Amino acid sequence: MKSKENLQKEQLYREFVQREENLIHAPYNPELEFYSCIREGNVEKIKQLCNEPLTDKKGLGKLSENELQHFRYHFAITAALAARYCMEGGMSLSKAYSISDFYIQKVDTCKSRQDISDLHFLMCVDYTIRMKNLRKKKICSQPVAKCIDYICESLHTRIT
């Protein structure tokens, strides 16, 4: 394993190379808008935003030398952030994580850029539709939802 100093030097070198190659990351505000649309259940807007395939998006940081692995990592990041935004919007913790886990496991089986992009579209629309339906029901507040999560997680233990 590399020392902390060697890791820092390597990181500085990679930052230098990125600047030299004019590699830039995508702006933050469109990313916030994207996840907010999922949280709000805005299906039409998510379909618009996902119209450009994940594998064609500009400004994605380089996460792997292996192209498919690179996109799988970005997919996993999207799944994790979508889950968190959905939890903020009232989806139960167990449901949000379960969906995220499911799609991350599915992306492992993808064999092409197109497979990953197609699954990305399906996942984003799935989360968004679920949030739209959840907002329709809106039967309880977030604190009550947290209590329900706790009870569900503790069904096989004594609650006192």
Regions found by a protein language model. Give the residues of each.
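Basic, amphipathic alpha-helical hairpins
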Residues: V107-C110, R130-I139, I148-I159
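Poly-acidic low-complexity segments
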Residues: N42, I159-T160
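Alpha-helix N-cap/N′ positions at the starts of helices
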Residues: A26-N29, Q142, K146
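Gram-positive cell-envelope targeting signals
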Residues: M1-L7, C147-Y150, S154
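Hydrophobic, helix-rich cores of sensory/ligand-binding and other regulatory modules
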Residues: M1-R130
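Alpha-helix N-cap and coil->helix boundary residues
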Residues: S94-S98, I139-P143, I159
